[in-house]
Amino acid sequence: IVTVDCSDYPRPVCTLDYMPLCGSDNKTYSNKCNFCNAVVDSNGTITLSHFGRC
């Protein structure tokens, strides 16, 4: 199982780094920060599907 530690999130500002992750909502997030903010916003219903684009 692939996991990402989102314990330091949410953050008000994310960098523009491009290291894509694919969420369980089948959406590609540009980096860990954007993904983790979405996880927090979804109350943990979004999980990591895999690294890279969906």
From Swiss-Prot:
One GO molecular-function entry: serine-type endopeptidase inhibitor activity
Glycosylation sites: N43
Pfam families linked to this entry: Kazal_1
Keywords, alphabetical: Disulfide bond, Glycoprotein, Protease inhibitor, Repeat, Secreted, Serine protease inhibitor
Site (Reactive bond 3): L16, D17
Disulfide topology: C6-C36, C14-C33, C22-C54
One term under GO cellular component: extracellular region
Subcellular location: Secreted
Residues annotated as domain Kazal-like: 4-54
Domain comment in the entry: Avian ovomucoid consists of three homologous, tandem Kazal family inhibitory domains.
Protein name: Ovomucoid
